[in-house]
Amino acid sequence: MKLAIVIGCLWIAPVMAMNVAFLNYGKKEEAYWHSASRAMQAAAADLGIKLEVSYAERKQQRMLAAAQALAARPAGKRPDYVIFSNDFALGAELLPILDGAGIKTFMAFSGRGSDQDIGLPRQRYRHWLGSLDPDAEQGGYLTTKALIQQARARRPDAGKYELLAIGGDPVTPSSVRRSDGMRRAAREAKDVELVSEVYAAWDQARAQQQAGWLFQRHPAPDMLWAGNDLMAFGAMQAWAECCVARGQPPLIGTINTSDQALQALAEGRLAALAGGHFMTGAMALVMLYDHAHGKDFADLGMEQVLPVFMLFDARSAGRFMQRFKGADFSSINFRRYSRVLNPALKQYSFAFGPLLR
């Protein structure tokens, strides 16, 4: 009788939900970081995860303060896992804070930089489990290749094509890799010259200023590549203010799936757009769900880089805006990506393109 009571109590006992905190480096009103958080919330709902999101508003001290606040909580109130992006190489300061509190950590969106002296996951910082990076180099490469193809079609007899570039920053690993992809595409095209490259810290106003200077020095560029949509819009504003009388604006390519960027692509104001990487945090939750349920991702590599980017056209942009209106990603079944819930899965497949078919 006592055994039956014990078994019954175990059966009806509530399962303790995973508690995950996401330290979002971006601004709450930024379309990209808002979409990233919304996708994570949809994944958390599917997987029974309690998700806590805080925004650093692109301020490094706020990011560090948020980590310190989590670490200072009583042991029973701390999250099981913390996800953060290694923007501006902040991981070197975040890891000691969180690891010292015994909190498991995971880098998403931007992992360890090749020149960062933080060691490898699970070594110096033993609670740092790993990272998931979108293949940022792929995003830069795809958009620049598309620009080059369109520049050749627009001026087939030019012989030489000028490319300008506005990157995010020279420190954040994902920013560096996006620019690497842009440069690789330019190098492969023997008829393209990258005539100037600047940084605008992902900021629209700063990009507008930088682009204005670029257009003074290079009055008739064929193409302009920007590391994110906000900087692309800044470049568009700069051209509209200074250079409309010169004739055709440069073909502009960028990265991110904000409504404004997708609409600009559909209207032809953007020539090239890649995206899908905002899903990285949601997929990180899938990996951590599996880790918590006994299926460690380490067999696939602790630092994973996945080709999640897709190149959009007007049709796929329209489909995206229709299916995910209002950044509502609840129609995605995130449980299907879990190796715990789908034992036949041998590896993770997080490509974004199939979601629009």
Task: Spell out what each predicted region is.
Residues K104-D117, W225-L270, M279:
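Venus flytrap/periplasmic-binding-protein-like
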Residues N19-A39, A43-A44, L51-A66, F84-A89, ...:
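Extracytoplasmic "Venus flytrap"
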